[in-house]
């Protein structure tokens, strides 16, 4: 009995002394959490949603933690030109069209005549604040003055591009200036503020009898401006965004050409690097045609614009490299060399032109604009017209030049 009591007493004392030590140990040693596994970034990681302020803009991709070679970086970068304080007339945007009336003001009682007068419009690259003032003088085929008109500055200033629109005035008496003959007419455009001649040239107006007109009335005709001379002339252009600029090649075609049947392939130093059939774009630009042409496709001129967005671009800022959508993009302004554009219609080659990129990160100046005194903000390209797609007269087109001004360096 006494022995049992001693054993029990010893057990109680052991428990009493051990409890404070155990309590102190639990307070001093915190519970260590298990580490959570982190996902490994992959190339399929999706960018964050675009914000409302910049819809459709790609978002920066996560920086790669790979120990491989670092991505390319640095310039040269494409720089968007600033609009000049002195207006720059852009001759490639000059459009001369005919406005016609189903009567002739000199024979008021004859309703079977068709008369016409010119209307023009053009763009000016300009960043100044003063209102633009221009006038146009028109000359008859014999060189005598036909009439003059003040041109309207429409206030259509595009803040993004620095482009302003100037065009013929809205004149209810324009029909009193109309004529009933075709031929080669002269035009002179003057900047009224300094009395400088910004452009002088000629345009050919063709008078023809439409097939849909009444054969009994020989003077029920139509008129159009002959634009065959545009076919051997192309332009290398750039469309600027914040981080990149898309190169655009502009060309003219004659006939009712379907854009879906066109394909433009881009070659660099002899190797194809892009095609509009794979992520590229073929867009219709300006269109000129005879109003009463009916089904005559030969009286239709259409500008097409070829580009390869996301495939080839001009890099403007280093930020562009952070966007997943551009990780495989070729930056042309960092790839000096020679480029060739070949255009196909239903698989048959119909156009070819070439341009170069200089070491300064922009189109190399081929000198055509400068030596022909054409103050465009684009690069003029000689275009080789191939095949039988276009029903045009190459000899007459070369003779006509650029609105009557011979252009050196072109290949008709």
Protein language model features and the residues they cover:
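Contiguous beta-strand segments within globular domains
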Residues: 91-133, 222-268, 376-412
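N-terminal propeptides/low-complexity segments immediately following signal peptides
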Residues: 24-70
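Solvent-exposed serine/threonine-rich low-complexity stretches and specific carbohydrate-binding patches
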Residues: 142-163, 274-309, 355
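Aromatic sugar-binding surface patches on proteins
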Residues: 116, 155-174, 294-327
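A glycine-anchored, Pro-Gly-centered beta-turn/N-cap motif
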Residues: 179-188, 335-338, 342-347
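Conserved aromatic beta-strand anchor motif in extracellular beta-sandwich/beta-rich domains
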Residues: 136-140, 189, 264-268, 343
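N-terminal export/membrane-targeting signals
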Residues: 1-24
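Short beta-strand elements
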Residues: 194-223, 348-387, 403-408
């Amino acid at each position: 009995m006494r022995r049992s009591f001693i054993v029990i007493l010893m057990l109680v004392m052991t428990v009493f002394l051990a409890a404070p030590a155990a309590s102190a140990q639990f307070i001093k040693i915190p519970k260590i959490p298990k580490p959570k596994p982190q996902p490994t970034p992959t190339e399929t990681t999706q960018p964050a949603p675009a914000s409302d302020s910049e819809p459709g803009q790609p978002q920066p991709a996560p920086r790669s933690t790979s120990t491989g070679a670092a991505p390319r970086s640095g310039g040269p970068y494409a720089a968007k030109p600033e609009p000049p304080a002195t207006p720059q007339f852009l001759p490639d945007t000059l459009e001369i069209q005919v406005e016609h009336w189903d009567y002739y003001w000199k024979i008021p009682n004859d309703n079977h005549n068709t008369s016409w007068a010119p209307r023009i419009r053009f763009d000016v690259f300009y960043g100044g604040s003063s209102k633009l003032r221009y006038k146009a003088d028109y000359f008859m085929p014999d060189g005598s003055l036909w009439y003059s008109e003040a041109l309207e500055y429409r206030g259509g200033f595009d803040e993004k591009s620095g482009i302003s629109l100037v065009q013929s005035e809205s004149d209810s008496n324009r029909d009193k200036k109309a004529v009933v003959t075709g031929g080669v007419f002269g035009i002179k455009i003057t900047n009224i503020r300094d009395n400088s001649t910004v452009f002088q040239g000629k345009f050919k107006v063709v008078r023809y009898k439409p097939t849909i007109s009444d054969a009994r009335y020989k003077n029920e005709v139509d008129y159009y401006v002959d634009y065959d001379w545009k076919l051997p002339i192309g332009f290398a252009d750039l469309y600027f965004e914040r981080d990149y600029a898309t190169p655009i090649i502009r060309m003219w075609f004659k006939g009712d050409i379907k854009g879906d049947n066109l394909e433009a392939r881009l070659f660099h130093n002899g190797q194809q690097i892009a095609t509009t059939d794979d992520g590229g774009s073929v867009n219709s630009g300006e269109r000129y045609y005879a109003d009463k042409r009916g089904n005559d496709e030969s009286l239709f001129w259409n500008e097409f614009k070829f580009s390869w967005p996301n495939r080839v671009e001009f890099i403007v800022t280093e930020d562009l490299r952070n966007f997943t959508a551009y990780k495989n993009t070729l930056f042309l302004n960092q790839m000096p060399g020679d480029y060739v554009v070949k255009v196909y219609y239903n698989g048959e080659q119909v156009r070819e032109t070439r341009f170069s990129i200089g070491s300064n990160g922009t189109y190399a100046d081929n000198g055509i604009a400068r030596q022909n005194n054409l103050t465009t903000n684009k690069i003029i390209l000689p275009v080789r017209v191939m095949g039988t797609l276009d029903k045009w007269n190459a000899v007459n087109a070369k003779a006509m030049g650029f609105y009557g001004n011979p252009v050196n360096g072109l290949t008709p």
